[in-house]
Amino acid sequence: FYSFYSNYLKEADFTTTEIGFLWAVGVIAEIIMFAYAHLFLSRYSLKNLVSLCLIMTSIRWMVAGLFSNSFIAQFAAQTIHAFSFGLFHLIAMRMIFQNFSAGQQGRGQALYSTMWGLGVAFGSILAGHYWKIYGGSIIFISASGIVLLGLLWVKWLPSQFEQPISMRN
């Protein structure tokens, strides 16, 4: 997403001002999520929230792929960044905090950053390879489906992530 979204919008004849504005919408949505995430974290299990983040990411990428020429649709898709990155990142930090000792939390964050970076790199390489063959819309729609495979991973999260944070000891 990060590697190709601006180019994708440029191909759809968005101005650089509109592209910059849409990126700002995503950042603002993320900041709002950081401010209010406690409402989600205190009410819902981390397993359910990870599932929600994956589903919202799929919706975001599907909207981006299906409505490439619609500023309103892209605006709406960018607000989902609150879930596709903001809430997911907070959940990852919470999992690191709970599963790594104080002295090992830096390593936990390094592991998370490495896995995130490898995912971005691998996804960017694949998207770049297939972009000219299939076009941006198909790439975003395909990514929308692929991200749902992450839901299979969620069932293997440890049982300690099945309760809201407020319910844990």
What are the language-model segments listed below?
Residues 1-22:
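Helix-loop boundary and gating motifs at the non-cytosolic
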Residues 16-17, 100-112:
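Loop-to-transmembrane helix entry/capping segments in MFS-fold secondary transporters
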Residues 32-46, 131-132:
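Helix-to-loop junctions at the C-terminal end of transmembrane segments
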Residues 48-63:
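Structural signature of the two symmetry-related core transmembrane helices
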Residues 65-77:
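Helix-loop junctions at membrane interfaces in 12-TM secondary transporters
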Residues 87-100:
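Intracellular juxtamembrane helix-capping segments at the cytosolic ends
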Residues 129-147:
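A membrane-interface helix-boundary motif in multi-pass transporters
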Residues 142-169:
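Multi-pass alpha-helical transporter architecture, strongest
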